[in-house]
Amino acid sequence: MASTSAASNELVSSTINTILPTLVDGLDLNQRQSHDFFQQVLQGNIDPALMASVLTALKIKGETPEEIAGAAIAIRAAATPFPERNKEDIVADCVGTGGDGANTINISTTAAVLAAACGLKMAKHGNRSVSSMSGSADLLEAFGVNLSMSPETANHCLAQTNLCFLYAPAYHSGFKYAGPVRKAMGIRTLFNILGPLVNPAKPNIMLLGVYTPELLMPMAQALQLTGVKRAFVVHGSGLDEIALHGNTQAIEINNGELIERTISPQDFGLKNYTLEEIKGGTPAENADIIRDILSGQGKDAHNAAVIVNCAALLYLHDKAESLTQAAQLATEVLASGKGLSTLLTLVKLSNQDVSSTQTELKADK
């Protein structure tokens, strides 16, 4: 047994030693090489100088889908486990890479809440702000969501209210080994686009926004390699969301097929709004805006931004035959105020110890 482990470690070490020379020669890594390298990064086994060199070489060359997927699979495997579900159970995420610099309201987070209110199972994976004053974690914390809830509590939230939040730093402790290197480098690297791909709940449906159109195809192909069967990868005229101020470039993943699309607000039966109309603020300011939206009292532009992204999720779940029909469903649920009650239920459940809750339920019986 020990000799097998030693041989395996020796093989990984040999692989790591070939990675930088391969990249310096302008060649791509295969998925296994990328996986093994990032696996060692997460265990603290990679020298900071080598890590910085490899990240820089990947950046200069341009990361391939295999390199992205290999890293993502390694990171997800090393994450704190989320309770397994039945293979036929559908779970989705609505997430962006960040980095678009637009400082909009929290569109993807709010769309995820609305989608949960529409009956979809949403496991939202997120962090604090990257490209704005308020990230998904900042917003949900402002509402009172317990970011440090256990995986069991998060799973209970998902079962009870169709919604949970997985705070990235609570699941990906191995990132601490890369933190100082990333900070010293001061540039975007592969790590900046991995967040949407490493959700520990392993969603099988995704609405994934990217900050540049150059990432559309690589991220779509990487999603396929990580096992996602149904998704939209989108870039909306400068945003990592579906846009209202212009067209959205999209790649639809449909069971192995990649379909390039251009989507406009009119495809949802809506009109255009300016980017200025959906600008956000601090977490507290955004929380007030989101509370109005989810209670059915939001401004038209804010509502529309959330509706189009929620509608895309409904369409991917085959809850509607067209984006227009999906938008109508999202609009009806939004007007009902059910979105806010869904979020407030998440707040309540996230602050309960699921083990004690289950004990109380047994006692009641």
Curated annotation (Swiss-Prot):
Q: Give GO BP annotations, semicolon-separated.
A: L-tryptophan biosynthetic process
Query: What EC number is given for this enzyme?
Result: 2.4.2.18
Query: What keywords appear on the UniProt entry?
Result: Amino-acid biosynthesis, Aromatic amino acid biosynthesis, Glycosyltransferase, Magnesium, Metal-binding, Transferase, Tryptophan biosynthesis
A Pfam family this chain is assigned to: Glycos_transf_3
GO CC terms, sorted: cytosol
| Cofactors demanded by this protein | Mg(2+)
- Positions bound to Mg(2+) 1: 108, 241
Transferase as UniProt keyword: yes
**What Gene3D superfamilies does the record tag this protein with?**
Nucleoside phosphorylase/phosphoribosyltransferase catalytic domain, Transferase, Pyrimidine Nucleoside Phosphorylase, Chain C
Tell me which InterPro entries the record gives.
Anthranilate_Pribosyl_Tfrase, Glycosyl_Trfase_fam3, Glycosyl_Trfase_fam3_N_dom, Glycosyl_Trfase_fam3_N_dom_sf, Nuc_phospho_transferase
Q: Which residues does the record give as anthranilate 2 binding sites?
A: 182
Q: How is the cofactor bound?
A: Binds 2 magnesium ions per monomer.
Q: Extract one GO molecular function annotation from the record.
A: magnesium ion binding
Tell whether Thylakoid is among the UniProt keywords: no
| Catalyses which reaction(s) | N-(5-phospho-beta-D-ribosyl)anthranilate + diphosphate = 5-phospho-alpha-D-ribose 1-diphosphate + anthranilate
Q: Which SUPFAM superfamilies match?
A: Nucleoside phosphorylase/phosphoribosyltransferase catalytic domain, Nucleoside phosphorylase/phosphoribosyltransferase N-terminal domain
Residues involved in 5-phospho-alpha-D-ribose 1-diphosphate binding: 96, 99-100, 104, 106-109, 124-132, 136
Q: Specify the pathway.
A: Amino-acid biosynthesis; L-tryptophan biosynthesis; L-tryptophan from chorismate: step 2/5
User: Which HAMAP family does this chain map to?
Assistant: TrpD
Subunit structure comment from the entry: Homodimer.
Give the similarity note: Belongs to the anthranilate phosphoribosyltransferase family.
What's this chain's function?
Catalyzes the transfer of the phosphoribosyl group of 5-phosphorylribose-1-pyrophosphate (PRPP) to anthranilate to yield N-(5'-phosphoribosyl)-anthranilate (PRA).
Identify this protein by name. Anthranilate phosphoribosyltransferase
Please give the organism: Colwellia psychrerythraea (strain 34H / ATCC BAA-681) (Vibrio psychroerythus)
